[in-house]
Amino acid sequence: MDTFSALADPTRRNILEMLSKKGQLSATDIYDKFSASHPAISQHLKVLREANLVQVEKKAQQRIYQVNPEAMHKLEVWAKKMAQVLDVRFEALDKVLEVEKRKIKKHG
């Protein structure tokens, strides 16, 4: 699954937010934070792993999850690029609106 499809689900975004704040959490700790069934949360964790958004380390009988910092950095870079593109477009729209306002005032 691609990154954006993985991020489309609010439960998966919540898991990522928790991991970002806590650093590392066991699968059990993650399960305990949600009212959904363990299999449902396991599926969400699988999607996050497949999208390379989280890393998992097996310690004894536990699976410890953490955010993949490289993937988060790539998302941040992409989001900043998109913000710049939108800023340019909004600035152009502001200019058009200013011209239209002046026309209305002049001929109003």
Per-segment meaning from a language model:
Residues 1, 9-13:
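Short alpha-helical elements of helix-turn-helix
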Residues 4-5, 64:
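Short basic coil micro-motifs at the edges of alpha-helical modules that engage polyanionic partners
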Residues 5-8, 17-21:
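Short, locally clustered residues in the helix-turn-helix/winged-helix DNA-binding domain
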Residues 18-21, 25-26, 32-33, 38, ...:
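C-terminal regulatory/oligomerization modules of transcriptional regulators
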Residues 45-46:
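Short, hydrophobic-biased segments on the C-terminal half of alpha helices
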Residues 58-64:
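Short, Lys/Arg-rich nucleic-acid/phosphate-binding segment
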